[in-house]
Amino acid sequence: VAVGFVRPARPDDAGEIARIQLATWRVAYRRVLPKHVLDEIDEAFLALRWTDAVTAPPTARHRVLVAVEQNAVEQAVQEYVVGFAASGPFDDGALAADEDHTPDRENVAAVTDMLVEPRWGRRGHGSRLLAASVDLWRGDGFDSAVCWAFDADAATRKFLTSAGWAPDGATRALDVDDLLIPQLRLHTTL
């Protein structure tokens, strides 16, 4: 019997978070990002960054959560980290190129990453990550949230819009190896 749940990330999850991030990007974004860019991403470097995010977040409202699938196999319990979500207060990284940082955004959460490894998809892990994140955001005093998605990432856009998110009109282009990749920002009220 498989059971799925979400918990705060622990330092020993950092390597698995990095592996999931890289594996997911290489599948989900292979038509969005240049292959050589995806091939050159250093998983060990990502793991160090995730260790920092888990052990030394910039504020108490920065969070990293992991989705876990737990299976009982022959009287033993096996747990697999299958996805993760990272978020924090709205900051300059959540701005569009033509926006100024304004103080009225202090109650806005910003999703920096939310990924489920494709082989674990369609089992409710993304929905559990999003629901757990929303619960924490509300507890932290946020009243809305934003998330950037690649224009070409129909799966993420569909997932978020099915959960009540909508584009807020902000756009930007991510510069990857001199290739401008369009993104749009989605938002929701909590």
Label each PLM-derived region with a short phrase.
Residues 124:
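Glycine-rich phosphate-binding loop
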Residues 62-64, 180-185:
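Short hydrophobic/aromatic beta-strand or adjacent loop that forms the aromatic wall/cage
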